């Protein structure tokens, strides 16, 4: 009967947890009824470069990195920067720190409704992750409370964080790091939420100074994510990730595997090419030599020059 009806019903929503529950909750009336689901994704790194090139032909690699770090390719944020002609990394920071800037309250506006009355706990956890406390034990030590259930919901119900384990580890590995999925939210919790008292006091120029001061460190992580996206978009690799041992040492920024052709890329990623130490990278690679046995391994140094 359904096949005979010429009827198309679309349902869309911006609250991820609600849409997930309505269509994928086992006890919900619409469970299993959807014939197709479309998840809106950010622009690719190639598209971001095209947008920046069309609107700022003289852009630098620093501008491109900032464009990616602040937007993650999300159309709403891309549009705000383009419409305001803020397409250099300094102009982007200045725009975000202006009085009445929509960026200042964006994180709170989109997440409070998601989290409900427990939003302060979730915000504290996300702030910890954005500021480098990426292991559960480190977050719990800082917050002085157990957070296992909250991490599970942030990952599975809200799709805001993702769990990272070292390449070649078993899925049940306890050597876990957490990171915020969305680039802008990572930035928002790192700066706007952390320094919310500056915003409330109207000290936006001071906030801008802090962002400019800490931007090189913050953008280093964004550069790693940029290259992971680039490699993923190529579709040439069957597994992508990083590596670190149980002590958090021998860290490798990017490992890309083609498990069919038995090819591997092992890469060190730095903002400045002169800071890449290929000898040190190859020594780290020795710690995973067993796992790469049978692979043709290429060691690479990737920097902003390669964007």
Regions found by a protein language model. Name each.
Residues 17-22, 47-48, 275-276, 307:
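Switch/connector loops and helix/strand junctions flanking conserved nucleotide-binding motifs
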Residues 35-39, 299-301:
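Conserved beta-strand scaffold positions in the cores of enzyme catalytic domains, especially
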Residues 174-307:
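A cross-kingdom feature that marks ATP-driven nucleic-acid transaction machinery
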Residues 11-17, 21, 74, 303-306:
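A short beta-strand-to-loop transition that corresponds to the Sensor-1 phosphate-sensing loop
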Residues 37-185, 189-190:
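Interdomain hinge/linker elements that couple catalytic modules in large macromolecular machines
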Residues 1-2, 17, 88:
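A contiguous, low-structure linker/loop signature
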Residues 3-8:
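Short, small-residue-biased leader/transition segments that mark boundaries at the very start
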Residues 17-34:
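Short regulatory helix/loop adjacent to the ATP-binding pocket of P-loop NTPases
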